[in-house]
Amino acid sequence: MKLPDLRNFDLKEKRVLVRCDFDVPLSESDRKVADDTRIQTSLPTIQFLLNQNAKVILLAHLGRPEGQVNEEFSLKPVFEKLQELLPRTKINFQINELSNCELKTEDNEITLLENLRFNKGEEENSLEFAQKLASLGDFYINEAFAVSHREHASIVTLPRLLPHAAGFNFQKEITVLSSAFENPKRPVVVILGGVKEDKLKVIPGFLTWVDRILIGGYLPVLINKQPNLAIKDPKIEMGTLAENKLDLDLGTIERFSSVIQKAGTIIWAGPMGKIEDEEGQNSTRIIGQVIGSLNALRIAGGGDTEAALTKFNLLANMDYISTGGTAMLEFLANGDLPGLAALRE
């Protein structure tokens, strides 16, 4: 899939708006960034722009402040982490409302705007809000793949108001994930877990091209409670919880492992049990180990999945870790995303 390449544009001394994914976990004790992986993925694009003497304006959100200013969701910890990661670069933190916003970013400087979701216009996909953002820049870059399934102002409307391109990590996501469904090594096995009901919405799309779908985590319980969520298809294998209700039972682990061992491509999103509890860790660990033993294309995505892989030292078992969970699944299931479509226009 061809997207506008930022290297093909003259961005020297231009004001460049970069939509980043800075929705990072914060430590409860001191409200500092606990894991800077998402910030790190934006750095190659940011550094490229700085090398062009561009004025870099970063747009991002943190959490769900519901359109209200809430210090709990301030991007100040992200600002502090950026200063730590880019010690030689002047970085400004703009906390004013956009209506009062007069950016004084100089060439080769960065300005981080406060949480976009403090304004209702972001999640409402307001044209007026997007126009205010557009007035701050000459060019737009999407480096927030993980949010690109959202029809929000900074994702789908803003790129329609400015010349635009995909960031380096965004382009990498599309290239790697496209290879999984354009010419897949079969059988293709999708593993869905965790607790988010949203994952069930991608099943119809996957059924058009994958060979098996294994459903674990808390999702089987959700389906049992809401029969309208159930999709009957011979490609789908439903997990069963153990008596402790914290993990899959041994029979399910054996069934899932048997299917996975035959896979040519594996797509994994969501832990199989409640990994925060010691009694809920067995299935995720075993299935991760089985995946690691295979000569298959192994793709995982989502914060909870990455946390599980990290916890059990299984990150090296995967060929690619996507920054997106739901975005990855929606792209693989349906071949497109709202933010991706906006970049192609």
Where do the protein language model's features map onto the residues?
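Active-site loop-to-helix "anion-binding N-cap" substructures in soluble metabolic enzymes
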Residues: 1-345
